[in-house]
A protein has these predicted regions:
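Terminal targeting segments of Actinobacterial cell-envelope proteins
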Residues: 1-41, 65-87
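C-terminal region of N-terminal signal peptides and the immediate post-cleavage residues
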Residues: 53-96, 173, 515
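Beta-lactamase-like hydrolase cores
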Residues: 79-148, 218-228
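Mid-domain, small-residue-enriched loop/turn segments at the edges of structured enzyme/sensor domains
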Residues: 127, 185-214, 222-265, 272, ...
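Active-site SXXK
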Residues: 138, 152-170, 267, 294-295, ...
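Small-residue-rich helix-loop
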Residues: 143, 360-515
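Short, well-structured active-site flanking segments
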Residues: 167-182, 306-314, 423-426
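A small/polar active-site loop signature that marks catalytic segments
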Residues: 263, 272-425
């Protein structure tokens, strides 16, 4: 079985992989607070950097928030608010690392427990488990059945992110290539794991559409013209990188029909969506062939000026073994950037592709079984016990997944402050409460607004499952990691999501040092 390098991924050296590069993102306008609600947001939010040696913890600004002082009546200064919790006026492009104080007081477990037990209650049936840990020391601050296996929903993507960053590498890019075929007028579109292709020109500043089929077709047409090919040109597709069933039998047919996922292939347009802006609705059931046919259409258009035509239709074939003649290629955004997108949008299709690419990088089969084995192995290599963990998929759609809140808290701790600095690349992907991703429309009422901008966490939702795992800096400047998971819940009960958000908010606003 070909490894990821042979599949066309451009892989970096270990030294390159272990030195993450922070890139500023385009600033977003600050979101207005709900009427009558004052939000306390951090000075620095959008990238948290934990230095491995000299500075145990730090908050990176890339970009960050700058906020004014808060004043009470008649100009009287209000109680002092830590700088990371001040109200923002705008996003800043500044890039610095502001270290957190490693001597900041650790919350008292009894105080944390008292607060969370009052908040973490189900709305109707079911129950919650939860774990809170001090990120620097690993000290447990809260544990409600933390070792109990749970259906985690999309919190599973945290494990997949770890596996992708470790096994594939943060700076790796996936290559989609056009190869010379068995005859001069036959070409082969070779899939290399990029499922975020766009159908237009490549967009170097983008993640979705970073590599474009129009650019690939234009470059391929020029190469064919330079070789004197007159056509008609036959397009074949080699998508044999992945093996096993493309559709996981553990997934509900209703979820597949609704477009929550689709059969998994190593090439797709728009993460197997019908258009770049689509986030719901049915997906193509053969994303690889859909992408190949779109490429053939672009090649037909490019060939008109290059003096050749394209045979209608695309058939599957295998690329020739040995040295391959590459006519053209385009590369994806980096794995770190794709992980960011996966976590922010909770992209099931991209998560499943990452699992298979991680498996190939580890010398396993690019299948669902290979993916689940690779993800479990990478988590175990972090020193996290996986004896009772069971993975049925790597996106979190399967009800057969069994992972504990403690395992998720430990994974978040590994990302924020563990020794493997490659995992820091996942930090920017955690949605920010009230601002970005799947938390963008939450934390807007009076009971959760003080967590807005402070809580960064991966969400997870299935019919009777809800989960939230992430990190937060409390009022004393202590970095905490947490995981809350509810199972057997009453479907549609609004109070369950609120219970999670209030619990995370309590951590953000809790000094909890007994003073």
């Amino acid at each position: 079985m070909k490894g990821v390098d042979e599949a066309g991924a451009e892989k970096q050296t270990p030294e390159q992989q272990e030195t993450p590069v922070l890139r500023p993102r385009k600033p977003r306008p600050a979101k207005p607070a709900s009427k009558g609600v004052v939000r306390f947001l951090p000075l620095v939010l959008l990238t948290l950097v934990i230095a491995a040696l000299a500075v145990p913890m730090g908050l990176g600004v890339a970009p960050g928030f700058f906020g004014p002082s808060l004043f009470g009546v008649a100009g009287t200064p209000a109680p002092k608010v830590p700088p990371w919790q001040q109200v923002p006026k705008q996003l800043s492009r500044t890039q610095i690392v502001a270290p957190l104080d490693a001597s900041a007081p650790v919350p008292l477990p009894a105080d944390v427990t008292n607060q969370l037990n009052a908040l973490l209650t189900p709305d109707g049936g079911g129950d919650f488990t939860g774990v809170v840990e001090d990120a620097l020391t690993g000290l447990p601050l809260y544990d409600r059945d933390g070792a109990k296996n749970r259906v985690p929903a999309s919190n599973m993507k945290l494990l997949t992110a770890v596996a992708a960053l470790r096994a594939i590498g943060p700076e790796t890019r996936f290559s989609t290539r056009v190869l010379a075929g068995p005859s001069a007028s036959t070409i082969i579109l070779s899939a290399g794991g990029d499922v975020l292709l766009g159908d237009g020109p490549s967009q170097p500043s983008g993640v979705l559409g970073h590599a474009g089929l129009e650019t690939l077709a234009s470059d391929a047409a020029k190469a064919l013209q330079d070789r004197g090919v007159k056509g008609p040109v036959t397009v074949q597709l080699d998508d044999g990188l992945f093996t096993g069933p493309a559709l996981n039998p553990a997934w509900s047919p209703d979820d597949v029909a609704a477009g929550e996922t689709a059969p998994i292939f190593p090439i797709a347009l728009n993460s197997a969506r019908t258009s770049p802006g689509a986030t719901t609705g049915p997906r193509p059931q053969d994303a690889a062939l859909t992408a190949a046919e779109a490429f053939a259409g672009k090649l037909q258009a490019a060939g008109a000026s290059a003096g050749f035509t394209v045979v209608p239709g695309v058939e599957r074939a295998s690329a020739p073994a040995g040295k391959q003649d590459v006519l053209a290629s385009v590369v994806s955004a980096t794995v770190r950037e794709q992980v960011d997108l996966m976590l922010q949008t909770s992209d099931n299709y991209l998560a499943e592709v990452f699992g298979r690419m991680a498996a190939l990088s580890a010398g396993k089969q690019g299948s669902n079984d290979g993916a689940t084995a690779a993800v479990s192995a990478q988590v175990a290599e972090l020193g996290i016990a996986t004896d009772f963990m069971h993975l049925a998929d790597v996106s979190g759609l399967a009800l057969g997944n069994q992972v504990s809140a403690r395992q998720f808290a430990d994974v978040v701790r590994a990302i924020t402050s563990g020794p493997d600095t490659r995992l820091r690349a996942a930090l920017a992907g955690f949605p920010v409460a009230g601002l970005t991703g799947t938390l963008g429309d939450r934390y807007g009422d009076a009971s959760t607004s003080q967590g807005a901008g402070l809580v960064r966490a991966k969400t997870g939702t299935l019919n009777s499952v809800i989960a939230l795992s992430g990190y937060v800096v409390d009022t004393n400047g202590r970095l905490l990691v947490f995981s809350f998971i509810g199972n057997g819940l009453t479907p549609g009960a609004a109070g369950n999501k609120v219970a999670l958000d209030r619990s995370a908010t309590a951590l953000a606003s809790c000094g909890c040092t007994g003073g």
